[in-house]
């Protein structure tokens, strides 16, 4: 059976009440949505409440994370014809999925300069951490507002345990406090503007980190930008206005892959004893 004839890959996303293509909101999950759309891989999709993620992946015999607070997370895919790490053909975690899809569907390449592009993606992910942590303070309290009741209870409880205080207390109550976080986050993001701009006039063309060639490193940046686009348009516009429009150019060149959708398909979740 050829890749065009086989059953489509299935993509598992996190449920939200956001409208239209904004329903998909998690930056980690959106990385794989971008990969699927960029490569033109046919896929079906289903959306799942937070407390259903562990029983879903357990039922598919996906090996749990060996480290971290959560043993099971989205994104995940199910594609028995290519995934051999579990009996069901399912796997989770954005970077392993991205690498698997790039090997299975090599054109167009997700790492256009090979190992150098892979190293760039790892570097972007590491450099993103300070800005992402600051953004958590601003946007996590808004994220809980778009979840279903069961998802909200789970999200608030687990994130309160992680941060050591209620999510409602993460975002400063004063404009000065918010401005301090925003300015700090923007300072953390200046390095990405420099990388997108290149060494000087005429040295680089194209809106992507590697010029005219998009890659997974770009998707890490774009999905981070999408978080503010989903939850705080004023913040998103402020980020877009940074530098000489480098973020805006990257966004407009990439949004088609961010917003693309698969075919909706119901995927029942068995009721199992679970761990987070």
Curated annotation (Swiss-Prot):
GO MF entry, a single one: transferase activity
SUPFAM superfamilies in UniProt: GST C-terminal domain-like (SSF47616), Thioredoxin-like (SSF52833)
E.C. number: 2.5.1.-
KW Transferase (keyword) present: yes
Disruption phenotype: Does not alter the production of ustiloxin B.
InterPro entries xrefs: Glutathione-S-Trfase_C_sf, Glutathione_S-Trfase_N, GST_UstS-like_C, Thioredoxin-like_sf
Gene3D superfamilies the record matches: 1.20.1050.10, Glutaredoxin
Alphabetical keyword list: Transferase
Top-level enzyme category: transferase
Span of domain GST N-terminal: 16-109
Pathway: Mycotoxin biosynthesis
One Pfam match: GST_N_3
Function according to Swiss-Prot or TrEMBL: Glutathione S-transferase-like protein; part of the gene cluster that mediates the biosynthesis of the secondary metabolite ustiloxin B, an antimitotic tetrapeptide. First, ustA is processed by the subtilisin-like endoprotease Kex2 that is outside the ustiloxin B gene cluster, at the C-terminal side of Arg-Lys, after transfer to Golgi apparatus through the endoplasmic reticulum (ER). Cleavage by KEX2 generates 16 peptides YAIG-I to YAIG-XVI.
Protein family according to the UniProt entry: Belongs to the GST superfamily.
Name of the protein this chain belongs to: Glutathione S-transferase-like protein ustS
């Amino acid at each position: 059976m050829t890749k065009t004839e086989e059953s489509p890959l299935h993509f598992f996303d996190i449920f939200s009440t956001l409208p239209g293509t904004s329903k998909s909101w998690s930056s980690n999950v959106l990385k794989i949505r971008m990969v699927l759309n960029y490569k033109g891989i046919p896929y079906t999709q289903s959306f799942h409440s937070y407390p259903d993620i562990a029983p879903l992946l357990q039922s598919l015999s996906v090996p749990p994370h060996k480290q971290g607070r959560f043993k099971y997370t989205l994104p995940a895919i199910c594609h028995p014809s290519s995934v051999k790490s579990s009996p069901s053909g399912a796997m989770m975690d954005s970077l392993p999925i991205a690498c698997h899809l790039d090997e299975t569907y090599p054109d167009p390449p997700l790492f256009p300069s090979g190992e150098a592009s892979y190293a760039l993606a790892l570097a972007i992910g590491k450099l993103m951490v300070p800005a992402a942590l600051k953004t958590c303070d601003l946007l996590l309290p808004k994220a809980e507002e778009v979840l279903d009741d069961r998802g909200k209870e789970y999200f608030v409880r687990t994130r309160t345990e992680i941060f050591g205080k209620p999510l409602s207390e993460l975002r400063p109550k004063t404009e000065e406090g918010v401005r301090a976080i925003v300015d700090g986050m923007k300072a953390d993001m200046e390095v990405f503007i420099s990388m997108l701009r290149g060494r000087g006039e005429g040295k680089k063309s194209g809106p992507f980190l590697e010029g005219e060639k998009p890659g997974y490193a770009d998707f890490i940046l774009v999905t981070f930008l999408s978080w503010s686009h989903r939850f705080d348009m004023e913040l998103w516009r402020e980020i877009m206005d940074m530098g000489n429009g480098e973020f805006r150019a990257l966004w407009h060149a990439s949004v088609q892959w961010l917003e693309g959708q698969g075919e909706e398909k119901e995927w029942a979740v068995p009721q199992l004893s679970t761990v987070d």
